[in-house]
């Protein structure tokens, strides 16, 4: 019998839960409005619900009235933005994911030691912009192997590398291998800077791919980790669609006769997953549902001390 295989874990990670709760608790404690620098997480459903509750999402701190509260998003911010907030008398509350903060701290420490930092990631992504701000003159961003091959450093130069927390493990491994081939003495952290949730969601998806011929990744198109999930499937020859609303689950699926995999990015609410699942069952009523558990997650991050 044809079936839907639901990946587990999927959806919200500990950092996303903490970030959303930070905004919700701030609104409960101080009332509206609460300003948020950038979308708190990259998911339109989450942002719209928080906006309805009184959150105001801004990209420029000049939009925030003096002496107001502003929350920094889960993706992190450069030190210059923290300084600007202080200069403008803003009360900053930091919802940066702890695993992103770990990368900031490592970059800052190794830059002070005189290393040049190779930062693997998407240079326009807000997380990379924040990390690069820790030591802009000592950081080079690389997105692919070609950019590794173009690096101007010698094998003797003191180099340190880290990655964006939401990268594809496949792509990161290829880039790291190229880096180590050129620079055998390059340093890094003892454990991967790709976060546990990214690794788990990609691992869970890889686990089911031999059993399916089509995958729905439920997530926002702006979400890095959701896009990487789609790429994980496509890299292994499985058709994948990134959807963020049940209306995007279309009759296209009727062209496929095999099992269907479903996963969700780390900023995707479970109710959106369930709505997409219901739409799929309307299109193909005789589908059974099977849960595939890859690993249990029990990570919890404490809310900022101000709350």
UniProtKB/Swiss-Prot annotation:
Its cofactor is [4Fe-4S] cluster. It is an enzyme of class 1 (oxidoreductase). GO terms for biological process: dimethylallyl diphosphate biosynthetic process; isopentenyl diphosphate biosynthetic process, methylerythritol 4-phosphate pathway; terpenoid biosynthetic process. (2E)-4-hydroxy-3-methylbut-2-enyl diphosphate binds at residues 42, 75, 125, 165, 223-225, 267. Keywords: 4Fe-4S, Iron, Iron-sulfur, Isoprene biosynthesis, Metal-binding, Oxidoreductase. It holds the Pfam family LYTB. Isopentenyl diphosphate binds at residues 42, 75, 125, 223-225, 267. [4Fe-4S] cluster binds at residues 13, 97, 195. Dimethylallyl diphosphate binds at residues 42, 75, 125, 223-225, 267. It comes from the Bacteria. Its EC number is 1.17.7.4. Binds 1 [4Fe-4S] cluster per subunit. Catalyzes the conversion of 1-hydroxy-2-methyl-2-(E)-butenyl 4-diphosphate (HMBPP) into a mixture of isopentenyl diphosphate (IPP) and dimethylallyl diphosphate (DMAPP). Acts in the terminal step of the DOXP/MEP pathway for isoprenoid precursor biosynthesis. HAMAP family: IspH. PANTHER family: 4-HYDROXY-3-METHYLBUT-2-ENYL DIPHOSPHATE REDUCTASE. NCBIfam families: ispH_lytB (TIGR00216), PRK01045.1-4 (NF002190). This is 4-hydroxy-3-methylbut-2-enyl diphosphate reductase. It comes from Chlamydia trachomatis serovar L2 (strain ATCC VR-902B / DSM 19102 / 434/Bu).
């Amino acid at each position: 019998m044809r079936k839907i295989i639901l990946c587990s874990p999927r959806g919200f990670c500990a950092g996303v839960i903490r970030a959303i709760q930070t905004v919700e608790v701030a609104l409960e404690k101080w009332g509206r409005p609460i300003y948020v620098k950038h979308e708190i997480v990259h998911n339109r459903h989450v942002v719209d619900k928080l906006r309805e509750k009184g959150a105001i999402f801004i990209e420029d701190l000049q939009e925030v009235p003096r002496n107001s509260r502003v929350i920094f998003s889960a993706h992190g911010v450069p030190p210059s933005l923290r300084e600007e907030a202080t200069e403008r008398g803003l009360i900053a509350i930091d919802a940066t994911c702890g695993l992103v903060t770990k990368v900031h701290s490592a970059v800052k420490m190794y830059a002070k030691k005189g290393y040049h930092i190779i930062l693997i990631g998407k240079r326009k992504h807000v997380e990379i912009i924040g990390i690069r701000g820790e030591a802009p003159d000592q950081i080079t961003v690389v997105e692919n192997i070609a950019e590794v091959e173009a690096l101007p450093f010698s094998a003797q130069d003191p180099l340190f590398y880290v990655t964006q927390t939401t990268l594809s493990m496949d792509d990161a491994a290829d880039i790291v291998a190229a880096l180590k081939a050129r620079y055998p003495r390059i340093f890094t952290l003892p454990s991967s800077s790709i976060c546990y949730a990214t690794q788990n969601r990609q691992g869970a998806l890889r686990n089911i791919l031999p059993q399916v011929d089509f995958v729905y990744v439920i997530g926002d198109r702006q979400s890095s980790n959701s896009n990487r999930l789609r790429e994980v499937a496509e890299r292994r020859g499985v058709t994948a669609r990134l959807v963020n609303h049940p209306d995007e689950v279309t009759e296209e699926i009727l062209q496929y006769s095999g099992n269907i995999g479903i996963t969700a990015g780390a900023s995707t609410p479970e109710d959106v997953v369930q709505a997409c699942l219901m739409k799929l069952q309307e299109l193909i009523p005789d589908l059974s549902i099977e849960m595939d558990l890859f690993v249990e997650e029990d990570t919890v991050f404490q809310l900022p001390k101000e709350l």
